[in-house]
């Protein structure tokens, strides 16, 4: 049983959705879309079970340097158990304590059911649980004035426009002129 748990949790990853990640994918919902500078996007890929919950530290350890709104994409999180739910609640608390906003999106059937049973929406706010990444980005735009104002670093992020292939090409073209 322990060997099974270990192998399953080895397949789980928590990572930031970066410009490089988007470009490496063949088709990605974020291709040709601007990620606002005040938004950071992370994803959980694989089952988020006992034994894999420490992988959320990828976000926690970077929290002081992250923008005021964090979107956690759960589309590829195939399963969650009570330890995973507790870890997500702890993450939500840490993000809230840092005066940032957390938006969850794209939850699959099994994790969504477990989250509903645990009343997770009461912990983070039902308005911060979205069906899709597009909906989460819209919600982030609605929250942005409040989040940017509340966050000490305000609008110190300017990296996202240049992350886009078209913006980077335009910048390179104007630099050559």
What does each model-found stretch correspond to?
Residues 1-9:
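Canonical bilayer-spanning transmembrane alpha-helix
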Residues 9-177:
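Cytosolic C-terminal regulatory domains/tails of membrane transporters and channels
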């Amino acid at each position: 049983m322990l060997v099974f748990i270990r192998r399953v949790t080895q397949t789980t990853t928590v990572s930031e959705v970066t410009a490089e990640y988007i470009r490496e994918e063949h088709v990605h919902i974020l291709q040709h879309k601007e990620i606002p500078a005040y938004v950071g996007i992370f994803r959980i890929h694989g089952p988020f079970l006992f034994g894999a919950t420490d992988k959320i530290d990828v976000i926690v350890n970077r929290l002081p340097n992250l923008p005021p709104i964090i979107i956690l994409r759960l589309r590829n999180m195939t399963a969650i158990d009570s330890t995973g739910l507790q870890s997500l609640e702890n993450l939500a608390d840490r993000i809230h304590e840092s005066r940032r906003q957390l938006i969850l999106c794209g939850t699959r059937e099994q994790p969504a059911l477990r989250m509903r049973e645990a009343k997770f929406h009461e912990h983070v706010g039902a308005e911060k649980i979205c069906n899709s990444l597009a909906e989460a980005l819209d919600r982030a735009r609605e929250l942005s004035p409040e989040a940017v104002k509340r966050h000490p670093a305000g609008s110190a992020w300017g990296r996202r426009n240049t992350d886009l292939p078209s913006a980077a090409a335009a910048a390179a073209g104007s630099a050559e002129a």
